[in-house]
Amino acid sequence: MGTYLDEILDFHRRESRGDTRSLDALIEKAGEVKPPRGFNKALMSSPVNEMAVIAEIKKRSPSLGELVSDLIPSFVSQEYEKGGASALSVLTNNQYFGGSSMDLREARAACSLPILRKDFTVDLRDVCDTRIMEADAVLLIAAALDDHELKDFIALANELEIDALVEVHDEDEVERVLVVGAQIIGVNQRDLQTFEVDTD
């Protein structure tokens, strides 16, 4: 029986196979975007002994359904910034989370915080798209990618001068992503295969 993750990845990989855009052209276009704000730098510059908060903008989820029907990214991003967030995470997946690239652009235009594009990255073109929509970091999910993909995606993110946040769920995945060069690691308490949450 397939999981939420399997279904979402199948959808994105099908879309990727139908994407005929030139990778070289996308890399060139991504290089023309204004400089990133420094996602990792913002997290690391949080005052000593204070937690750096990545505040999230999400309209819905596969497991919980609609979360906020009238969410306004510009307003929410400003409120998060006023509240002391170090960075933002914006869902751009429309099919399963109700997000869009416009949500990210709107949030970024309304505040000065660096932004993580939270989506399912399955192709090098996705990394380019992340930069083209002016995000400052790309999300890479260890459970969704093999070592070769992780290494290539991190390398391209570095080339485009954006940060890569690599998401893991357990210690084995931590060891895996460190080997391929992950610099920022996020721990998801939710197992993306079962969608169960483990708070231990």
Regions found by a protein language model. Give the residues of each.
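Non-cysteine beta-strand/loop elements that form the S-adenosyl-L-methionine
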Residues: 54-56, 141, 186-188
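Alpha/beta enzyme core
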Residues: 68-91, 110, 124-137, 150-164, ...
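Glycine-rich beta-to-alpha transition loops that act as phosphate-gripper elements at the mouths
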Residues: 56-60, 67-71, 94-98, 117-125, ...
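An N-cap/entry alpha-helix motif that binds or orients negatively charged groups
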Residues: 2-68
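Alpha-helix-loop-beta-strand connector modules within alpha/beta enzyme cores
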Residues: 38-49, 97-122, 142, 150-167, ...
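Glycine-rich, proline-tolerant flexible connector loops at the mouths of alpha/beta enzymes
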Residues: 24-34, 62-68, 86-106, 142, ...
